[in-house]
Regions:
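Surface-exposed patches in mature extracellular/periplasmic domains of secreted proteins
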Residues: 6-20, 82-91, 110-119
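Short pre-active-site segment immediately N-terminal to the catalytic Zn-binding motif
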Residues: 50-71, 89
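Solvent-exposed loop/turn segments at secondary-structure junctions
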Residues: 24-25, 49-53, 78, 85-87
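Active-site recognition of the HExxH zinc-binding catalytic motif
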Residues: 69-82
Length: 174
């Protein structure tokens, strides 16, 4: 994930830790396999064994390729949390960036498999990129976010604008 964000001139995060754990902290959604604890700059990822108990995630087998993708997603959240512009990014913008990074860093064959499981052409406009779309179907949100981003004339510059705030608004305009 750091290599993915390098062209955006984002530096490694001092003090960022990745912890492998048999469980996630209390309050994490029951279907979550990882989380980022912002104040502590700590990524907590299920160890591979409990991760694999999920059998599948987004329709893909819970294998080592997907495990790496999940870690890339959480590292993207950490980068976003530490480099986002003000005001704080909306939840939808944070997930958009994290899923674009996750899918973009997957091996090509794995990425094609994920996208085939969740067909579409990408969001038509930024108004469609919102918390409702995410809550209704996170896997589709992920695939449509990636497709939307790569359709941009300069996807990296577009991600930089999203990261700087103002492109993807949350519900209620923030």
């Amino acid at each position: 994930a750091f290599a993915f964000f390098a062209p955006l001139d984002l530096r490694p995060l001092p003090g960022l830790t990745i912890e492998l754990s048999m469980s996630l902290p209390a309050g994490a959604p029951s279907d979550a396999v990882a989380c980022f604890v912002i104040p502590q700059r700590r990524i907590i990822v299920l160890r591979y064994e409990p991760f694999s108990w999920h059998r599948s995630w987004f329709g893909l087998a819970a294998d080592k390729r997907l495990y790496r993708a999940v870690i890339a997603h959480e590292v993207a959240h950490a980068i976003v949390a530490c480099h986002a512009g003000e005001p704080r990014l909306s939840f939808a913008a944070q997930e958009y960036i994290a899923y674009v990074a996750m899918i973009a860093t997957m091996p090509e064959e794995h990425r094609r498999e994920l996208l085939a499981l969740h067909p579409g052409s990408g969001f038509d406009n930024v108004v469609q990129i919102n918390e409702f779309a995410y809550a209704f179907n996170p896997a589709r949100f992920a695939a449509e976010s990636y497709r939307h981003c790569i359709r941009q004339p300069d996807p990296r510059a577009y991600l930089r604008r999203v990261l700087d705030g103002g492109v993807i608004q949350g519900l209620g305009g923030y």
